[in-house]
Amino acid sequence: MSVATRDLETVTAQEVLAYAVDRFHPRLKMACSFQKEESVLLHMLTETCPDPRVFMIDTGVLFPETLQTWKRFEERFGVSIEVIDARSPDEPWTMTRCCGEAKIDALERGLIDVDAWISGIRREQGPTRAGAAKLEHDSRRGIWKVNPLADWSEKDLWRYIFEHDLPYHPLHDQGYASIGCAPCTAPGSGREGRWAGLDKTECGIHE
């Protein structure tokens, strides 16, 4: 079966990435939030593509540990991570703005020159992600979205990280399963630590 027609749901994460690189690079970018999923994806991507395009969204309120992990990722994986600034010099920081229009606007700017983007979302992270396909059309932006780890479990991630001795975000060792901006993130399993106490589990990027 040719790479153009193979069913990506039946192949490995590495094969999904290889397909994405073959089909879309250089108009392909990976979104990086420096969590355990990105530890795995960056390792796989740099094994597949010698010049990957990777970007992150800087809200101005990231954990210091996130900034440290950023540096470690660049050093270990030999990549220069593009910074998309979500801060506004004209408006004060608020959770509503940061977790809504600011991040979404920054993502749009980060993806303006691509035909596909790679994300680390996984189906087991919650009901809003349970239907994620390994390759799906992002109708909101008119491009493709690649989710190589869609069928991975938490155990799969840690097994891969330890087998390959990969750097990972230190807050994972302090009970943070999902890590976003400092004001909006607390320890917790799954995504329960994000916007704790609020009826919210997504910022809009993956909706």
Task: Locate the predicted segments by residue.
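Nucleotide-activated chemistry modules centered on ATP-dependent adenylation/adenylyltransferase
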Residues: 1-207
